[in-house]
Amino acid sequence: MISAEFNKIWSNYFHKENATLVANGKTAIFEALKILKSKHVALPTYTCHRILQACLNAGVIPYIVDCGLDLQIDVSKIPMEVDTVIVPHMFGIQADIKSLNSFKVIEDCSQCIGLPDLGKYSDVVIVSTGP
């Protein structure tokens, strides 16, 4: 009962049809990659190492892409092969998700709860509250 209520609150907050509780952020990213049928995934150079681990566990090809001064992935450096981009909002700095509209986007909102429009322009949102 509590899980169903929690899922409804989170899905509404992030503008999504569904929400699911999983054990941790690494599992959430793994599941998101499987749901999106991702094959080639870009992630920023500056991010939690568990994001790369989730990519490797999911069997996708990770592309580690340079960040700009704002610590967000540099869209101009994303290789053509990439079909999915994982975007963490590092230190609560909101990334420009709209600029990634030609990719499937997994938005990591673990560090930015409370910012406007979270989940509005991404395919999947993940939130982790622990290590």
Enumerate the predicted regions with their spans.
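Active-site phosphate-binding strand-loop segment of PLP-dependent enzymes
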Residues: 69-131
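Acidic active-site catalytic centers that drive phospho-/nucleotidyl reactions
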Residues: 7, 66, 108
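Conserved PLP-anchoring active-site segment centered on the Schiff-base-forming lysine
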Residues: 32-79
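Short, well-ordered alpha-helical microsegments
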Residues: 28-30, 49-52, 93-96, 113-114
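Conserved N-terminal alpha-helix of the aminotransferase class I/II PLP-enzyme fold
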Residues: 1-27, 46
